[in-house]
Amino acid sequence: MRRLIALFGAAFLLINVFSKAYAQGDEGALAIIVPGGGTYSRPITTDSEEAQAFFDQGIRMAWGFYFPESIASYQEAARLDPDSPMPHWGIAHAAGPNPNSRYQGLPDDPQGAGLAAIRRAMELADNG
């Protein structure tokens, strides 16, 4: 019975979070801000407070080894401010080699996403 209650509670929470994201009206969004995800901020050159928030969330997610979620947050920051190089740096950081993948014998940056992202960041580096 406790498992059933926990399952319904988790389902309700997920529905609540995603319905709020959908209600915000941005159907092209690649990620949402996860409440309670921390407060660390690393200022980047951007005029978009939302892009800054997603960049910060990307760092916090990467530090927690939530790499797919981190990449989604960085991609959303890049979508919101396409001229900022740092979201692309973040994608490279999260998509590139990490100790866990090497321990499992997985290849570094198997699809080349990290290399492509760092190249894009270098192209935009003069923007800030």
For the regions a language model picked out, list residue spans one by one.
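Bacterial N-terminal signal peptides
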Residues: 6-20
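Short coil/linker segments at helix-helix boundaries
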Residues: 25-128
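Positively charged n-region of N-terminal signal peptides that target proteins for export
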Residues: 1-4
